[in-house]
A protein has these predicted regions:
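Fungal secretory targeting signals
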Residues: 1-19
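The N-terminal extracellular segments of secreted preproproteins, especially immediately downstream
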Residues: 16, 161-162, 295, 385, ...
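A generic structural signal for short, non-catalytic loop/turn and secondary-structure boundary residues
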Residues: 19, 34-39, 277-279
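Short loop/turn motifs at secondary-structure junctions and domain boundaries
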Residues: 20-24
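Active-site mouth of glycoside hydrolases
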Residues: 26-269
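Extended, compositionally biased low-complexity polar/Lys-Gly-rich tracts
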Residues: 128-148, 228, 235-236, 243-246, ...
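Extracellular glycoside hydrolase catalytic/binding regions
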Residues: 173-176, 180-201, 205-356, 364, ...
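Aromatic-rich peripheral "rim/lid" segments of glycoside hydrolase catalytic domains that contact
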Residues: 336-426
Length: 426
């Protein structure tokens, strides 16, 4: 009987894995899986770019439990964020460090040891010798087992909470944004991810934004964007030709306006897909946190002009017909906010565009964020307290503090789950 049970479990796992059809490719505005079927991203962000440099929440919930919650909503992808500092440590400091040491470095000896013991209790596969990147491997493996794809996102260079104009991670050449190390880190991660059968794509950089200090070597403009992003894309493609490459825009990734029409980016430079041998691997990504929107037509119109019009291949003004994925958006997880203009508009409009998306954020709490340990995703009591700089909603955690259940079942069942179903109805 025991043998039969084990055999059944192995069979179920293999069936789940066999349902994944990587690698992906792009044709015009569509993303296709390896069988040629259209694939629409419908998933959530799982942060792993904080000071501990492993995916959040493992002291509260097993990897399998968190993945199963996403799978239970019908989601098909996880946007897994990482910092370049993780790779810098591996390549410049003699190799990766253990999870235990990383926790102690970030939280101090007492709290770091305490949280590590909690992690081991909930995730016994994480040992005293387990390194940070091995935890990323574990998350990827569990997602593969449960039928979810992995989209890596380079969220930041120096591990910390993102984003502001003064955090040193804003733009090429900023205090911590070493361009050479950034490109090296991207190459390393996509090379490492070759062993993940469910790895399909990477975002080159999260939320490029104007730095507080001017850097004459890397002026904040589209010309610099073109040079650095296309160079990075070429290096990523050379390191892993199978990976889709997501290009983010300016102003916290809220605009890619000149890209669909191949407008002049300065000095006659234009982004043209035809210039790239790997054009079938390029995707655009945008973020939106206009949570105070009062008009769906205004919100959707702004998104369209910001870059979603790249999906309109019938418009003769569109030179670069490309997929566009909304890789970040989020709203307060309570009993009513899912009904407001912002949430309801995106829930309807994005599926109507047959566009992909990943919501911010699965996390219910953080090991440490902005100096506060075990910070709850809804530390603010009022809506105004939940809004940080530049209208970024920071009370968008889908899970409760202990990652054991949904923070608001209404927001999930009548909000995000409906959006998943609308996006994937075929």
């Amino acid at each position: 009987m025991k043998l039969n049970i084990v055999s059944s479990l192995v069979l179920l796992q293999s069936l789940a894995c066999s349902a994944l059809n990587a690698p992906f490719s792009v044709s015009g505005r569509w993303i296709h899986d390896s069988k040629g079927e259209v694939f629409t991203y419908a998933g959530a962000n799982w942060p792993g770019a904080g000071e501990v440099m492993i995916p959040e929440g493992m002291q509260y919930a097993s990897i399998a439990s968190t993945v199963s919650k996403l799978k239970g909503l019908g989601m098909n992808v996880v946007r897994l964020t990482f910092p370049i500092e993780l790779v810098d440590d591996i390549l410049d400091k003699g190799g990766d460090v253990t999870v235990q040491k990383s926790l102690i470095n970030a939280l101090g000896s007492t709290n770091g040891t305490k949280v590590f013991d909690q992690i081991r209790k909930v995730n016994p596969q994480i040992k005293s010798t387990t390194t940070r990147l091995q935890v990323f491997d574990m998350v990827a493996a569990e997602c593969n087992k449960q039928g979810l794809y992995i989209h890596l996102d380079n969220h930041i260079s120096k591990a910390m909470w993102c984003c502001s104009r003064t955090d040193g991670n804003t733009w090429f050449g900023d205090t911590y944004y070493d361009v050479a190390k950034w490109m090296r880190g991207l190459e390393y991660m996509v090379s490492h991810a070759k062993k993940w059968p469910n790895f399909v794509s990477i975002g080159l950089r999260n939320e490029l934004r104007e730095p507080s200090t001017i850097n004459t070597q890397y002026p904040y403009n589209w010309g610099t964007w073109y040079t650095q992003m296309t160079t990075a894309a070429k290096r990523v493609n050379a390191a892993n030709p199978n990976a889709l490459i997501f290009l983010s825009g300016l102003n916290y990734d809220t605009t890619l306006a000149p890209i669909p029409t191949a407008s002049d980016l300065g000095n006659g430079v234009r982004f043209r897909l035809s210039d790239f041998s790997f054009a079938n691997k390029l995707v655009l990504e945008l973020h939106n946190y206009e949570t105070g929107a009062t008009s769906c037509s205004a919100l959707s119109g702004a998104l369209w002009n910001a870059g979603f019009k790249a999906q309109n291949s019938s418009d003769p003004s569109i030179v670069n017909s490309m997929p566009v994925v909304l890789t970040e958006f989020g709203f307060l997880q309570d009993s009513t906010t899912w009904k407001n203009v912002y949430a309801s508009c995106l829930r309807t409009w994005i599926p109507e565009q047959q566009a992909g998306w990943t919501t911010w954020v699965i996390a219910g709490s953080y090991y440490i964020r902005q100096g506060t340990q075990d910070l709850d995703e809804t530390w603010g009591k009022s809506h105004s307290q939940c809004v940080a700089m530049l209208q970024r909603l920071i009370c968008a955690g889908m899970l409760d503090h202990t990652w054991s259940g949904w923070r608001s079942r209404n927001a999930i069942e009548q909000g995000l789950k409906v959006m998943v179903q609308s996006s994937l109805k075929g």
